[in-house]
Amino acid sequence: MYRALTRDIEVVVEPFYLEEQSDPEDDRYVWGYRIVISNNSGVAVRLVNRYWNITDQNGQVDEVTGPGVVGEQPRLSPGDTYEYSSGCPLDTPSGLMFGHYQMETDEGELFDVDIPAFSLDSPGLLRVLN
């Protein structure tokens, strides 16, 4: 698992390879990832936007931005946890992802919360990226 802490908001990522959706002979490699966001701060926040940097093993970068996550913009009161799962296809057997969530307090303050860098490694790889 990979962890990042920003302003007492913790983001934990657990990536996993989806063999049944992958087809290495067609250069299709698919990973899922589970994310848990815990608000350990003293203020409520809403996740309003996301930013991902996805880099394959050849250095090809794909940047993804958009509102919320999986169609939601969850509000986390102090002590709340939000969990979701998503996925990422690549054309190479390994890659790296990192990013941030833009959060907004009830008072309208916007700030970024780091998503830790995590590696996407196919089973059986001799060299891993992270």
Swiss-Prot record:
Top-level division of the source organism's lineage: Bacteria
Domain called ApaG: residue spans: 3-127
Pfam families: DUF525
Residues that span the membrane, as ranges: none
Biological process, per Gene Ontology: error-free translesion synthesis
Annotated region (Disordered), positions in chain: 63-83
UniProt cross-references to HAMAP family, sorted A to Z: ApaG
NCBIfam families: PRK05461.1 (NF003967)
Protein name (record): Protein ApaG
Gene name, Swiss-Prot/TrEMBL: apaG
